[in-house]
Amino acid sequence: MTGQLVQYGRHRQRRSYARISEVLELPNLIEIQTSSYQWFLDEGLREMFQDISPIEDFTGNLSLEFIDYSLGEPKYPVEESKERDVTYSAPLRVKVRLINKETGEVKDQDVFMGDFPIMTDTGTFIINGAERVIVSQLVRSPSVYFSGKVDKNGKKGFTATVIPNRGAWLEYETDAKDVVYVRIDRTRKLPVTVLLRALGFGSDQEIIDLIGENEYLRNTLDKDNTENTDKALLEIYERLRPGEPPTVENAKSLLDSRFFDPKRYDLASVGRYKINKKLHIKNRLFNQRLAETLVDPETGEILAEKGAILDRRTLDKVLPYLENGIGFKKLYPNGGVVEDEVTLQSIKIYAPTDQEGEQTINVIGNAYIEEGVKNITPSDIIASISYFFNLLHGVGDTDDIDHLGNRRLRSVGELLQNQFRIGLSRMERVVRERMSIQDTNTITPQQLINIRPVIASIKEFFGSSQLSQFMDQTNPLAELTHKRRLSALGPGGLTRERAGMEVRDVHYSHYGRMCPIETPEGPNIGLINSLSSFAKVNRFGFIETPYRRVDPETGKVTPRIDYLTADEEDNYVVAQANARLNDDGSFVDDSIVARFRGENTVVPKDRVDYMDVSPKQVVSAATACIPFLENDDSNRALMGANMQRQAVPLMQPESPIVGTGMEYVSAKDSGAAVICRHPGIVERVEAKNIWVRRYEEVDGQKVKGNLDKYSLLKFVRSNQGTCYNQRPIVSVGDEVEKGEILADGPSMEKGELALGRNVMVGFMTWDGYNYEDAIIMSERLVKDDVYTSIHIEEYESEARDTKLGPEEITRDIPNVGEDALRNLDERGIIRVGAEVKDGDLLVGKVTPKGVTELTAEERLLHAIFGEKAREVRDTSLRVPHGGGGIILDVKVFNREDGDELPPGVNQLVRVYIVQKRKISEGDKMAGRHGNKGVISKILPEEDMPYLPDGTPIDIMLNPLGVPSRMNIGQVLELHLGMAARRLGLHVASPVFDGAREEDVWETLEEAGMSRDAKTVLYDGRTGEPFDNRVSVGIMYMIKLAHMVDDKLHARSTGPYSLVTQQPLGGKAQFGGQRFGEMEVWALEAYGAAYTLQEILTVKSDDVVGRVKTYEAIVKGDNVPEPGVPESFKVLIKELQSLGMDVKILSSDEEEIEMRDLEDDEDAKQNEGLSLPNDEESEELVSADAERDVVTKE
């Protein structure tokens, strides 16, 4: 027997074929959301208040300080917030101190700063009753970037950019004449020496002494027309503020505020870290030849001779001294922007590009600026200019912008913080204004602070930001993946149109950080990614991945695990997870396959620094659920990973027989299961609640403590209309641990993810019904509810105040018979449990109609009965097409009962209709290997091919779907599944470490099957065996959320667009089918003139003609001649608006007069035609036309 048994949770054992032992548990998969939000509450908010505190008025007399803050308790719990359509939030209170410096008076006050949305335990937010997820954003890290460029003549040059978190950009570039230019904040370019002069290095000689003599600097100085600091400052001022009269003082303050004011320029801690790392002197000294002797300033000891090569060992020896002051220079710029001294570190080396090797260049570092300095400093600017000149001489490296060392994540906490900062800075402006207006003696903090801008910016972020998304809740895996999604789009990120191939491509630094498989197909490919399974995010927002440390002395793999960012990993040689180890942790083989900076190489074992922790650290959670991933083509694996997220939760879920061992972890962390919070013993289990008696530790003894109640969700509608239902899987008396699963959620079985069902599949054709990936299925799957799913749809009706009076929800509806009202209660609302079909009443509602001129008869009635017969219109809520089912629940909200309703709404009724959908022809199904298809035929069980023992198979797939698509994983899954079913096992075949081909054959033999796993099949119709043996086995098949019931649509008459009078398009608008240009050609080709005329006129936009035709059909008369299509009139109007005089002539040259729609109405009245055109259908048209416009945008 191959493999070993592994326990997953309490209820499931699997035979695992893994050979590599797991040294690291998977982290909590939604930690990226929860820990980031926790950081925001603990530190992010405090940072924000510290940034703007204190706020002083323009005279400096009043000062407002933010001292402390606290979050209260949420108003409603999570479930109630969803029901009531409110935001799940807690009040934020801030302790504020107002100090009057004249009188010395101090006022403290607690100020309410609005309700702040709170993250639920599962990493989501409830905003206005809808569950939303904030997606993490991948952006360029603030830093300094150098890149090479080639101009049109083939001359090589360089560009460099200093990118802050917020503030002005600095860009350096070379031109064809070897002059170095600088751009400040995207303005016109200046010679770079102008900037140096403005910093206080006024003369040519000072600049040459600073940067070092070289031809590029000479060319630049020749181009530079300014001779001293003042002229340079004026030159820069003219570029930044063209048209304003320049003065030296203004120029100084402008430059100072642009770059050296922490309020205007912010690198953030990550930017400071990256710049210090990039501009550090040691990176450029590596392997260079010294042009000066390095001496220890304290002892006078010679550390490195002039002319020595600084290899790794020499550099390591010199490094401690470099940190402590070798080459440190204090410069005192005069008259520049900055008056303080500038500390630099400068060392001379020989230029590697120089042939004679005599030319020296200065390497300048920025001399270790503390992490707290968030703005750029003159030494940063000088060091970055020096780096640029060094690059021209072949010293230093250019950067790869797509490397994950240069891209970082903004998670929930930081995105919220940035939004909160915008709100606070708006508030700060208001506070300053109020300080100067109001009486300083009587003023209180409460009167100064206007919290509106803060609340507005937070609301805007959660409600309409691109990164705040309606949670994909089709199944638990979709939830989990959505929370772990990384997007390069959004504010401050890329746009789909601008993003090129390079950004979207898989990069070697993605290894273990971002999944190379899971990304959408289509315009977002490569811009939206998924976090790898073991990845974490560090405090700077860079993605780290864990590696096992190899001890450099002994060469053994140690238990120590280091998390490395992408640029840290570039310094090490990393072995694969499948490198063979001895029991003591040493490598078996002398040469090891390893990675170094994206190159796969074979290295001697003593050169290995780290080793992968697990084979699945490359891929995301969803991709890790695909068994035999290593045997699939990556394009198909991508489809497989994406389609698992579209699986509809079934009525009877079943976890896969062939799994990967990832099912348990994914289900547990997704938030769909009920997880035990404390160890204890189960006391009572009901359908809706589970009670667990806690175990407390007292003096090392286990003692029974409090009773915890866990509530289960029963038949709740998910965001996507699937059924969200939890079922207990523990029994009374079970002892449970913390973190154990107490109840399965949707698409779960025994604590494991269960997206589909294990069915018996044969690869064979059958009368051509499975042509082009179609699927043939046995009727057994319909009869036994194998693929039956439950769907819940929500409909709502609101009674509003109108100009003519309030709408009313009532049972008394004009022109509706008692039969249609039989399921409504006395309020006019449908009863729970009633079965409804398309068009049935759900909520009876009437709206007052406008007062019209009364006819003589009505006046007579009015005179007799006194009160006018009630003028109301029926605006009841009815079941839309394809929406029939059983009423699951009805919720009524009244303004009188204190429910929060939108303005103008008095009453709101929500009706939930549940449908049980069996699988049918036209539904889409898929396996886990990207093998998708549509059901083309459901055969009676007796017609399906059957095995020698008489068992009919369930599904027939086309064998031609395998070879060209190269997803062989499905065939291996099929064989292993059959063997496992026969042995009564569940198996786990982890990705990249699963069952090999030999393991599959051994398991087949163990199950007593033939080695090729094929079998004779008999035709169910004739009983004859098929000519060839067929591959039959167990495959895990999933029903996807593209069901034919949602797509089927038919229309006879319906709404028309206002302008063209043509039917609207699309199922949502109850639209027609577009008969387009090409379809017209087809009818023209057949010469079907009358059919064509009908389609273009009475079936589309001949307004009068279609009414007459309708009437003729009803009365049984002949259909009249078509008139003029409305769109033709629109075309004429358009030509007339361009100033053309358009006339329509008949065949005998007589002008035909085109009447407008209004004229047609009069004509109709005279002809006595009744158009179905009361206010209601008109209203429908305009509303739908508006929606039409919205969808088109």
Swiss-Prot record:
<dbReference type="InterPro" id="IPR037033">
    <property type="entry name" value="DNA-dir_RNAP_su2_hyb_sf"/>
</dbReference>
<dbReference type="InterPro" id="IPR015712">
    <property type="entry name" value="DNA-dir_RNA_pol_su2"/>
</dbReference>
<comment type="similarity">
    <text>Belongs to the RNA polymerase beta chain family.</text>
</comment>
<dbReference type="Pfam" id="PF04563">
    <property type="entry name" value="RNA_pol_Rpb2_1"/>
</dbReference>
<dbReference type="Pfam" id="PF00562">
    <property type="entry name" value="RNA_pol_Rpb2_6"/>
</dbReference>
<dbReference type="Pfam" id="PF04561">
    <property type="entry name" value="RNA_pol_Rpb2_2"/>
</dbReference>
<dbReference type="InterPro" id="IPR037034">
    <property type="entry name" value="RNA_pol_Rpb2_2_sf"/>
</dbReference>
<keyword id="KW-0240">DNA-directed RNA polymerase</keyword>
<dbReference type="InterPro" id="IPR007120">
    <property type="entry name" value="DNA-dir_RNAP_su2_dom"/>
</dbReference>
<dbReference type="GO" id="GO:0006351">
    <property type="term" value="P:DNA-templated transcription"/>
</dbReference>
<dbReference type="Pfam" id="PF04565">
    <property type="entry name" value="RNA_pol_Rpb2_3"/>
</dbReference>
<dbReference type="Pfam" id="PF04560">
    <property type="entry name" value="RNA_pol_Rpb2_7"/>
</dbReference>
<dbReference type="GO" id="GO:0032549">
    <property type="term" value="F:ribonucleoside binding"/>
</dbReference>
<feature type="region of interest" description="Disordered">
    <location>
        <begin position="1153"/>
        <end position="1193"/>
    </location>
</feature>
<keyword id="KW-0808">Transferase</keyword>
<dbReference type="InterPro" id="IPR019462">
    <property type="entry name" value="DNA-dir_RNA_pol_bsu_external_1"/>
</dbReference>
<keyword id="KW-0804">Transcription</keyword>
<feature type="compositionally biased region" description="Acidic residues">
    <location>
        <begin position="1153"/>
        <end position="1162"/>
    </location>
</feature>
<keyword id="KW-0548">Nucleotidyltransferase</keyword>
<dbReference type="InterPro" id="IPR007645">
    <property type="entry name" value="RNA_pol_Rpb2_3"/>
</dbReference>
<dbReference type="InterPro" id="IPR007642">
    <property type="entry name" value="RNA_pol_Rpb2_2"/>
</dbReference>
<dbReference type="InterPro" id="IPR007644">
    <property type="entry name" value="RNA_pol_bsu_protrusion"/>
</dbReference>
<comment type="subunit">
    <text>The RNAP catalytic core consists of 2 alpha, 1 beta, 1 beta' and 1 omega subunit. When a sigma factor is associated with the core the holoenzyme is formed, which can initiate transcription.</text>
</comment>
<comment type="function">
    <text>DNA-dependent RNA polymerase catalyzes the transcription of DNA into RNA using the four ribonucleoside triphosphates as substrates.</text>
</comment>
<dbReference type="InterPro" id="IPR042107">
    <property type="entry name" value="DNA-dir_RNA_pol_bsu_ext_1_sf"/>
</dbReference>
<dbReference type="Pfam" id="PF10385">
    <property type="entry name" value="RNA_pol_Rpb2_45"/>
</dbReference>
<protein>
    <recommendedName>
        <fullName>DNA-directed RNA polymerase subunit beta</fullName>
        <ecNumber>2.7.7.6</ecNumber>
    </recommendedName>
</protein>
<dbReference type="GO" id="GO:0003899">
    <property type="term" value="F:DNA-directed RNA polymerase activity"/>
</dbReference>
<dbReference type="InterPro" id="IPR014724">
    <property type="entry name" value="RNA_pol_RPB2_OB-fold"/>
</dbReference>
<dbReference type="InterPro" id="IPR010243">
    <property type="entry name" value="RNA_pol_bsu_bac"/>
</dbReference>
<dbReference type="InterPro" id="IPR007641">
    <property type="entry name" value="RNA_pol_Rpb2_7"/>
</dbReference>
<dbReference type="GO" id="GO:0003677">
    <property type="term" value="F:DNA binding"/>
</dbReference>
<dbReference type="GO" id="GO:0000428">
    <property type="term" value="C:DNA-directed RNA polymerase complex"/>
</dbReference>
<feature type="compositionally biased region" description="Basic and acidic residues">
    <location>
        <begin position="1184"/>
        <end position="1193"/>
    </location>
</feature>
<dbReference type="InterPro" id="IPR007121">
    <property type="entry name" value="RNA_pol_bsu_CS"/>
</dbReference>
